[in-house]
A protein has these predicted regions:
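Conserved ABC ATPase "signature" region
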Residues: 110, 117-138, 190
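Helix-to-loop junction immediately C-terminal to a conserved catalytic motif
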Residues: 66
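Conserved signature/switch motifs of ABC ATPase nucleotide-binding domains
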Residues: 141-144, 162
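The feature captures the beta-strand-to-loop junction immediately N-terminal to the Walker
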Residues: 51-53
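Conserved ABC transporter NBD signature motif
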Residues: 74-86, 122
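Hydrophobic anchor residue at the start of the ABC signature
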Residues: 156
């Protein structure tokens, strides 16, 4: 499949999270600490996963990076830019594709361009991205006519058409069956390798994190801190039954078990 020639590989940016903490107000009026002094650097074009117990603050960190929340303390930078709000240079894909049911697949992908007021100039890119995610034959279809994996590919195309330097993936494959999930892991990797976008993936699936990532950040229960960062030095494509793969899996399980007991 041909990949559209785009500037996004050159536009991939670094990310820095500097001593960030985040608290919310609990129903009883007390402070509820979600994140505690998180510091993290992500290289341009890197694929990094966040793994940790449910409710530990992984999605909160992603929302801070997206500019949808503000930190209680610390700061975040995308490249040299202080993150102070949402930006088209930071795309976000959720577990639910959030497609507009009354719009065709083509028009769902166009939404981001329309919001930025550049649809007329870049209308041709919609066709390119339909081809990129293998849905050119479904351009006139509606979301209810797609499978879960196909709908998630539309969500990825909608995020990527803005050429974000950073793409944030919040459990985007979590609702899919095991077979479709593995196929979509390869699909996301293909898009990442073709476009060079910096990607951060939140996942509860340890095998998914190892299969896809350059590095894996292990987070503690709330208030989340970084327990350890693991370099995944395995050749691609990766074999889930390889002894080195299984050794990393064992290490992560032990870290998560230790973090929950600490």
């Amino acid at each position: 499949m041909n990949v559209p020639a785009t500037p996004s590989r050159l536009a991939a940016v670094s990310l820095r999270v500097g001593d960030v903490s985040k608290s919310f107000v609990a129903p009883d009026g007390s402070d509820l600490a979600a994140l505690e002094r998180i510091s993290l650097s992500v290289r341009p074009g890197e694929m990094l996963s966040l793994v940790g117990p449910s409710g530990c603050g992984k999605s909160t960190l992603l929302r801070l990076i997206a500019g949808l929340e503000t930190p209680t303390a610390g700061a975040l930078w995308a490249g040299d830019e202080l993150i102070a709000g949402p930006s088209a240079d930071r795309g976000l894909v959720f577990q639910d594709p959030n497609l507009f049911p009354w719009l065709t697949i083509r028009r769902n992908i166009q939404v981001g361009l329309s919001a930025r007021g550049v649809l007329r100039k870049k209308r041709h890119e919609v066709d390119e991205f339909l081809r990129l995610v293998g849905l050119e034959e479904f351009a006139g279809a509606y979301p209810h006519q797609l499978s879960g994996g196909m709908a998630q590919r539309v969500a990825l195309a909608r995020a990527l058409i803005n050429h974000p330097g950073i793409l944030l993936l919040d459990e985007p494959l979590g609702a899919l069956d095991a077979f479709t999930r593995m196929k979509m892991q390869d699909e996301v990797l293909r898009l990442w390798q073709a476009r060079g976008t910096t990607m951060l993936l939140v996942t509860h699936d340890i095998d998914e994190a190892i299969y896809m990532s350059d590095r894996i950040v292990i987070m503690t229960p709330r208030p989340a801190r970084i327990e350890r960062t693991i370099d995944v030095r395995l050749d691609r494509p990766r074999n889930r039954s390889d002894s080195a793969f299984l050794a990393i899996r064992k290490e992560i399980l032990e870290l998560l078990h230790f973090a929950e007991r600490a």
